[in-house]
């Protein structure tokens, strides 16, 4: 059935059901698999959130304390509501953690991962003051590109789909109408010529390569066509008998063994940006019309530059179907009006989907800010003749455009901001932890002598075998405090923003192992610092209002001590600021509720000791490796690189890949 072109919003809300193949309506339901039952505040939180969704309440907030099992609560809600779900996190690391957790909860359903696919990205820009043009430079991670394609293919073919995404989900993506229309189905018994299948594959940006198969490629041997879709790991083998599809099967890429036969397979495009040939010609005409209209508004130099560049791009598109920076012409290919919102991942969802915004106090501001940053960068490119004005429309959504998709929303945060509180029909608290652990005891002490007092508290903590965190206002203070503690025979290290993720992970591991006892830092709110060994947190200069000393930040920092049953937090301040008062009062309120619940149910909280993972091998020094051992080391590193990519630790995988390249050069030099 042909679907007429729609704007992104109209397409999502009116025509979605026409864009799906038959499997979509027969796909399985969500099935939550877990070895434990909801406990603490989880049962009532699940019940209230489900009730709110069934009553069609547009916004709800899950206010859950650290360690209360918010992800498990959300998984239970998804399991009961049974709608395709988008979970948005504010960074890749958190998105990867959530993706892995949801995969464990829903092993029989489709859990997908959608983040930016750039390992490295330098956007195109122009600096008028220096007359310096900076060309776009990017390195795409093929594994993440494959996972992005898998997310959209799953949304087109199934209902039991959870997509965990970063804010990349509001950036421009190919038209879902084209993505579906240009795909094609293969059925056993269909009458189709081999040439027709090959032409269709080429049309949707598959590459023929009879030597090396990888996602987005196909090979041909006689009447057998092997395809690896862009969102697949294994081979789809299509065997023809004359002009008839005789057999379709999934074949293990590594072993060549047939895994299963299938009656039907739908081949989606190998890229998100696919354009039918007739639309391509129409788009080129539209681009040239815009060029003619815009040239008179520019100076002589800018006009010449833009005309030369645009005509070259059009020639490339006509010859090859693409050009460098083709995304800047996306408005023309999508037949959108100037200023009209682009298609994005949200347009691949049905109208009635569930939206979870994790750590909403950080994610909502990110969603707000994306459009303005993109617009300001492109202004000089347009003003100085490097891009047509239509480049503005290759952009992320404005926040008000994003809000149109917010029909069934759950904000998740320990410290919701004003936006969440003002919009939510209900705020569901999850205060009681399944483990019985309570929020730490909080004290406020004078600033005078704060360093000496912190040192005394640290000594007590170290004597009982626990660790301490101390947060300062500046990097210089963190360094000075670390040196002071070291002079007083206390093993301390400091953490700051210059330290890379891998080093940071190793520092936290060494803290847990007891190689040092105190971690000093400025921003201790980042993920990965929920350490059960931490029995004391000292917050220096707590009455200096501002970043990291507002009530939300203080509550978050206090929560870092909530995984230890004997923990304590001390805020050093001479003035009881409004932020301190709110943080202390809220912590005491939660603590009282938790203690009362434990007494009523006879629960004695115990610190849960998480296993400490193995050390990340130091891979920066290769000088000690004997030349004869390098080939074996490369094999081991390659295996480790693939494992890192599988667990979505792409920073580690990139580091390993670069080391492998370095070692391969050494082998060639021998």
Swiss-Prot record:
Residues annotated as domain UVR: 631-666
GO biological process, one term: SOS response
Domain Helicase C-terminal positions: 453-612
Main location: cytoplasm
Domain Helicase ATP-binding: 51-433
Keywords of this entry: ATP-binding, Cytoplasm, DNA damage, DNA excision, DNA repair, Excision nuclease, Nucleotide-binding, SOS response
KW DNA repair (keyword) present: yes
Protein residues bound to ATP: 64-71
Any one annotated GO CC term: cytoplasm
Pfam families: Helicase_C, ResIII, UVR, UvrB, UvrB_inter
Subcellular location(s) of the protein: Cytoplasm
Similarity section: Belongs to the UvrB family.
Role description: The UvrABC repair system catalyzes the recognition and processing of DNA lesions. A damage recognition complex composed of 2 UvrA and 2 UvrB subunits scans DNA for abnormalities. Upon binding of the UvrA(2)B(2) complex to a putative damaged site, the DNA wraps around one UvrB monomer. DNA wrap is dependent on ATP binding by UvrB and probably causes local melting of the DNA helix, facilitating insertion of UvrB beta-hairpin between the DNA strands. Then UvrB probes one DNA strand for the presence of a lesion.
Protein name in UniProt: UvrABC system protein B
């Amino acid at each position: 059935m042909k679907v007429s072109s729609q704007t992104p919003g109209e397409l999502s809300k009116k025509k979605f059901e026409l864009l799906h193949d038959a499997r979509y309506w027969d796909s399985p339901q969500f099935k939550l698999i877990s070895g434990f039952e909801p406990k603490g505040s989880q049962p009532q939180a699940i019940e209230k959130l489900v009730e709110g969704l069934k009553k069609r309440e547009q916004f709800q907030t899950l206010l859950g304390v650290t360690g209360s099992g918010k992800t498990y609560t959300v998984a239970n809600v998804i399991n009961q509501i049974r709608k395709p779900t988008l979970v948005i996190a504010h960074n890749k690391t958190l998105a990867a953690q959530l993706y892995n957790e949801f995969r464990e909860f829903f092993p029989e359903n489709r859990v997908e991962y959608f983040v930016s696919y750039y390992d490295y990205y330098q956007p195109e820009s122009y600096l008028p003051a220096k007359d310096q043009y900076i060309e776009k430079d990017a390195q795409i991670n093929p594994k993440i590109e494959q996972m992005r394609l898998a997310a959209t293919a799953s949304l087109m073919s199934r209902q039991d789909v959870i997509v965990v995404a970063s804010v990349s989900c509001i950036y421009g993506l190919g038209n879902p109408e084209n993505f579906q229309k240009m795909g094609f189905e293969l059925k056993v018994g269909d009458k189709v010529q081999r040439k027709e299948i090959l032409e269709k594959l080429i049309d949707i940006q598959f590459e023929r390569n009879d030597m090396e198969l990888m996602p987005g490629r196909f090979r041909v041997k006689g009447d057998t066509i092997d395809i690896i879709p862009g969102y697949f790991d294994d081979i789809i083998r299509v065997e023809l008998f004359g002009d008839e599809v005789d057999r379709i099967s999934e074949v293990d890429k590594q072993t060549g063994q047939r895994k299963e036969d299938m009656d039907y397979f739908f081949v989606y495009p190998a890229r998100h940006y696919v354009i039918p040939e007739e639309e391509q010609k129409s788009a080129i005409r539209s681009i040239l019309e815009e060029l003619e209209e815009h040239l008179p508004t520019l100076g002589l130099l800018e006009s010449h530059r833009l005309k030369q560049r645009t005509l070259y791009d059009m020639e490339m598109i006509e010859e090859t179907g693409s050009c460098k920076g083709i995304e800047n012409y996306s408005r023309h290919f999508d037949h959108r009006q100037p200023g009209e919102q682009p298609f994005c991942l949200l347009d691949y969802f049905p109208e009635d989907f569930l939206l979870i915004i994790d750590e909403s106090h950080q994610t909502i501001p990110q969603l707000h800010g994306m459009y303005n940053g993109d617009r300001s960068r492109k202004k000089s490119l347009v003003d100085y003749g490097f891009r047509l004005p239509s480049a503005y429309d290759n952009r992320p959504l404005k926040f008000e455009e994003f809000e149109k998709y917010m029909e069934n929303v759950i904000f998740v945060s320990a410290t919701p901001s004003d936006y969440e509180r003002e919009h939510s029909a209900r705020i569901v608290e999850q205060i009681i932890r399944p483990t019985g652990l309570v929020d730490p005891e909080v004290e406020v002490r004078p600033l005078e002598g704060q360093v000496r007092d912190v040192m005394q508290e640290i000594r007590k903590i170290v004597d009982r075998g626990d660790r301490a965190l101390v947060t300062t206002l500046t990097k210089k203070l963190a360094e000075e405090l670390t040196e002071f503690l070291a002079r007083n025979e206390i093993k301390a290290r400091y953490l700051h923003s210059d330290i890379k993720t891998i080093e940071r992970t190793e520092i936290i591991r060494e803290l847990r192992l007891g190689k040092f006892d105190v971690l000093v830092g400025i921003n201790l709110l980042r993920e990965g610092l929920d350490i059960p060994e931490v029995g004391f947190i000292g917050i220096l200069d707590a009455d200096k209002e501002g970043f990291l000393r507002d009530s939300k930040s203080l509550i978050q920092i206090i929560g870092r001590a909530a995984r230890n049953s004997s923990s304590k937090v001390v805020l050093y301040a001479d003035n009881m600021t409004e932020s301190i008062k709110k943080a202390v009062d809220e912590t005491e309120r939660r603590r009282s509720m938790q203690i009362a619940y434990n007494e009523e149910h006879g629960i004695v909280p115990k610190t849960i000791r998480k296993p400490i993972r193995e050390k990340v091998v130091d891979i920066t020094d290769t000088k000690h490796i004997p030349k004869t051992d390098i080939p074996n080391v490369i094999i081991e590193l390659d295996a480790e690189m693939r494992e890192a990519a599988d667990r979505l630790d792409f920073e580690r995988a990139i580091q390993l890949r670069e080391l492998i390249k370095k070692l391969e050069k050494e082998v060639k030099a021998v």
